[in-house]
Amino acid sequence: MAANRFTRGIAFSLSTLSFCVAALCTSTQAGAQPAAVTIGVTLSSTGPGASLGIPEKQAIGMLAPTLGGLPVRYIVLDDATDPTTATKNARRLATEDKVDAIIGSSTTPACLAVAAVAADTRTPQLGLCPFVPSAAQMRYVFSLPQSVAVMADAVLDDMKAHKVKTLGFIGFSDSYGEAWLKDIQARAGARQIQVAPVERYARNDQSVTAQALKMMSANVDAVIIAASGTPGALPMSTLRERGYKGRIYQTHGVANNDFLRVAGKSAEGVILPVGNILVAEQLSPSHPGKAVATDFAKRYEAQYGAGSRNLFAGYAYDAYLVLDRAVAVAAKQAQPGTQSFRDALVSAIEQTRGLAATHGMINVNAQDHSAYGEDGRVLVTVKGGKWTID
C-alpha cells in the first residue's frame, strides 16, 4: 500500500521546505486547477530535541506530492526545541501562511506551545510527541504518539512481574517529565510499587551525579528515566558508572539509534516500551500493523542507512497517513484554505478507525484525540546494542 507514497524531489529554500509537483498542480480539465492543501510543520531540528526532529523532517521529505488526492505544499520550520520559537512558528503558519493543518512539534513543551496557537486559530494540530492539551484546546489538537498512560502500563506491568517494590524516578524538569511522574505515581500503587525518590534534571544538564547517588542511597529495586532523545542517556550511564545493579527503564522518548550511540554499553539491558516500527520484523505475521511498519522501515533505511529506523520518523509518516485519509473526506465538503475545510478536517480525523500505520492501528474519536491503544506498543530490551522483543 505504501509503496507509491514516497518520492524525492523536494525543494529546500532556507528553513522552509515546500513542494508541489507541477504536473499535479495542473487540472485534467482545461482552465481549472485543483485547490492545493498547505500543511505547516514545526520540528525540533536543532537543540536538545534534534535526535527526534531530524528523523521527523527526513520522513516529511519522503512524502508523496499529494494528500487525499490533492496537490500538497509542506512548509517546514525549525523551532530549535524552544517552546517560544514553536509558538512563533505556529502563529506564522496559521496566520500568515494560512495552513490547513500543523504537524509538530517534536518535544512535549513545544507541542503544548503549538497547541495553544492551534486552538486559538482553529487550526488542526497533529503533535508528534505524547502530551495532553487542556480541555479548551482539545477540539483542534491530536497526538500521534502512544500516550504516557498506554506506555506506563507496559513498564509497570513488567515491574510487577519482576517483583519490583521500590521505584526511583529521574525525569526531565519539564512537562514531559511531569506527565510521566504523575502517571507513574497514579498507577504504581495498584501494583504495590512505591515511587521514591523523585529527582529531576534539565534537558541540557551535563551531570546528574547527585540524582544518581540518591537512587543508590535508597537502594531502589528499579529506576525509570523519563526523558527523550539523547539527553536520556545521561542518567542511565551515570547509574551504571556508579555501580547500580537494579533494573533500569526508559520511555519511548529515547527510542532511536542516536540514543544507543550516546549511551554505549550503559544501554545494555535497559527496558522500554516502543512502537512497532522499531521491531517490525520481530512482530507476529498476524499483527495488523506489521506490513505498514515493515514497508516504511525498509524505505526509510534505504534512504538513510541500515538500522536508521526510529519511532519519530514513523510518527511523522503516521501524521501523513491520517491526513491523507481525512483530506479526501474534508475536500468533499469545503475548499482547502478555508475555515470550513479545517473544521471538516478535524471531523474527518475524529472518524479515523482501523488505520494501519507504522506503530499499530490508529483509532480516533471525538472524546479521545490520541492515536494508539495497547496494540501500538511492545516492550523491548536492549541486547547486544539492538532493540529486542523478549
Feature annotation, model-predicted:
Residues 2-9, 21, 31-390:
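Extracytosolic ligand-binding ectodomains
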Residues 11-26:
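Bacterial N-terminal signal peptides
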